[in-house]
């Protein structure tokens, strides 16, 4: 399979331009998008720029902070080299297929190549209506902009594949939701915005020609090694399955709940995308749901791996016309590929869980040991993040159970498990300090707790941004103790719990 032609004829990069756009998706056929101009903002004001990410993308942060930069980040000015488009896609939403969704309040400005030669999208979220808006106003309230900035950057600091946030801007205008709210625009960075739903869009129309164009483009952009395989499209599918199996495991190891895991919110590049009603658990429970629209718990915490597998099955269905020779052979190949998801997920999950438990060697019974701890945590309302952080200290001290015991409603439930855990630790020759160091690197002390995010949003809506900035700074170092910010590691006090989160559309 030759390289995708769109990459060979991408727009030439202007090294003198403040943002060095090098666009490829806008070279695809126009069935893939709508060319559109962002809506303007009445009185744009910069809220935050991600300096480190800007430098990685070869963009001068000082430009982004200038009036000219803010004009670009708000959609008021189209930068040289930018080719704004709204991408088309379809998707299963809570199991029901919608043949046309698309970017209803997001506009892809273009692509840049970072200092390591990796390609990224720059997208404005909250930048106005497109033909995919479906009656919406195309705008974003400030709250969802702040939530995505906080959580996506926290996920990146945790080492979890994710879209990023380059900047947040106040528009100086209000939007009408359940009440009048200040408006904002987020500049999102992603390795691409290719979704399972992008493939479903063309498959649903029987447009095999453009489906092949899309698959070839995705291979070139994300998995170029698949080009040389005997069946490049199956190799591509296998790579996506493996990437999403690893991603699901990473979510489960930190207590992250996506909240709206539709096929249009499943990125084939293996990144977490679309943070609308997402949340991190405080007290552990496998059936935890935060999203206000997930009334039946389809996307509950424990269901996430199975949902990803379901989404991958829908993805396989779109690729059948491209895979192997003949429908039966293609179905057989796809089934063999999706069957590997369970083992790939389980391998990534138990490998990560072993590190959280201080185990370096693979032994029979480790998965059961992990499952038993989680069951006891659920029964005793133990905080997910604090339990694993406290285990780090317990592992370093044979008599150091007190910190973990205090997190359990019935401390004896932990004692029973801890006896077996310490027996398992004794089977490995490893210093206590080496074990503790490894565990600390897998168990953060700081996560974006829901009540902290809500407090930052409420203050921001009132025009005060200190809580937002401080929370972003603390979460940039989630594995460091940062004693001066110890309160950020604490669970919500009674009355502070956030029971529901909202999409923010």
Curated annotation (Swiss-Prot):
Residues 485-505 are annotated as: Disordered. It comes from the Bacteria. Its cofactor is Mg(2+); Mn(2+). The active site is at residue 264. Its EC number is 2.7.7.-, 2.7.7.108. ATP binds at residues 102, 104-105, 125, 137-138, 188, 195, 274. It catalyses: L-seryl-[protein] + ATP = 3-O-(5'-adenylyl)-L-seryl-[protein] + diphosphate; L-threonyl-[protein] + ATP = 3-O-(5'-adenylyl)-L-threonyl-[protein] + diphosphate; L-tyrosyl-[protein] + ATP = O-(5'-adenylyl)-L-tyrosyl-[protein] + diphosphate; L-histidyl-[protein] + UTP = N(tele)-(5'-uridylyl)-L-histidyl-[protein] + diphosphate. InterPro entries: SelO. Keywords: ATP-binding, Magnesium, Manganese, Metal-binding, Nucleotide-binding, Nucleotidyltransferase, Transferase. Pfam families: SelO. Mg(2+) binds at residues 265, 274. The keyword Oxidoreductase does not apply. Transmembrane segments: none annotated. Belongs to the SELO family. This is Protein nucleotidyltransferase YdiU. The lineage of its organism: Bacteria, Pseudomonadati, Pseudomonadota, Alphaproteobacteria, Hyphomicrobiales. The gene is ydiU.
């Amino acid at each position: 399979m030759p390289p995708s032609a769109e990459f060979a004829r991408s727009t030439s990069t202007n090294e003198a331009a403040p943002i060095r756009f090098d666009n490829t998706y806008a070279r695809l056929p126009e069935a893939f998008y709508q060319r559109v101009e962002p809506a303007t903002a009445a009185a744009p004001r910069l809220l935050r720029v991600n300096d480190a990410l800007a430098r990685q993308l070869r963009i001068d942060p000082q430009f982004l902070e200038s009036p000219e930069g803010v004009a670009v980040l708000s959609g008021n000015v189209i930068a040289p080299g930018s080719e704004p488009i709204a991408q088309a896609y379809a998707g299963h939403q809570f199991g029901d297929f919608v043949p046309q969704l698309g970017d209803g309040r997001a506009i892809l400005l273009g692509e840049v190549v970072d200092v390591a030669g990796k390609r990224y999208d720059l997208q404005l979220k909250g930048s106005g209506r497109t033909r995919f808006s479906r009656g919406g106003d195309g705008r974003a309230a400030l709250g969802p902009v702040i939530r995505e900035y906080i959580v996506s950057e926290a996920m990146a600091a945790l080492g979890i594949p994710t879209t990023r946030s380059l900047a947040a801007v106040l528009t100086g205008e209000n939007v009408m939701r359940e009440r009048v709210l200040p408006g904002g625009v987020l500049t999102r960075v992603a390795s691409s915005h290719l979704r399972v739903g992008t493939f479903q869009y063309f498959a649903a129309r029987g447009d095999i020609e453009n489906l092949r164009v899309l698959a070839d483009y995705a291979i070139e952009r994300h998995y170029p090694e698949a080009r040389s395989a005997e069946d490049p499209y199956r190799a591509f599918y296998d790579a996506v399955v493996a990437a999403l199996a690893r991603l699901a495991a990473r979510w489960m190891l930190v207590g992250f709940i996506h909240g709206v895991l539709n096929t249009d919110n499943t990125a084939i590049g293996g990144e977490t995308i679309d943070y609308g009603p997402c949340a991190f658990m405080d007290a552990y429970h496998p059936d935890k749901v935060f999203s206000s629209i997930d009334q039946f718990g389809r996307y509950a915490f424990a269901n996430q791996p199975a949902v990803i597998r379901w989404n991958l099955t829908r993805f396989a269905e779109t690729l059948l016309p491209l895979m192997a020779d003949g429908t039966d052979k293609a179905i057989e190949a796809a089934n063999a590929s999706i069957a590997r998801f369970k083992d790939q997920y389980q391998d990534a999950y138990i490998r990560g869980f072993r590190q959280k438990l201080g185990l370096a060697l693979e032994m029979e019974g480790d998965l059961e040991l992990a499952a038993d701890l989680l069951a006891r945590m659920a029964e005793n309302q133990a905080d997910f993040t604090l339990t694993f952080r406290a285990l780090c200290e317990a592992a370093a001290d044979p008599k150091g159970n007190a910190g973990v015991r205090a997190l359990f409603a019935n401390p004896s439930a932990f004692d029973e498990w801890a006896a077996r855990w310490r027996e398992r630790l004794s089977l490995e020759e490893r210093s206590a300090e080496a074990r503790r160091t490894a565990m600390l690197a897998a168990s953060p002390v700081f996560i974006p707790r829901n009540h902290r995010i809500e407090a930052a949003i409420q203050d921001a809506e009132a025009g005060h941004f200190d809580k937002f900035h401080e929370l972003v700074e603390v979460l940039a170092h989630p594995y460091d103790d940062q004693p001066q910010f110890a309160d950020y590691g604490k669970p919500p006090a009674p009355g502070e719990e956030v029971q529901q989160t909202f999409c923010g559309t």
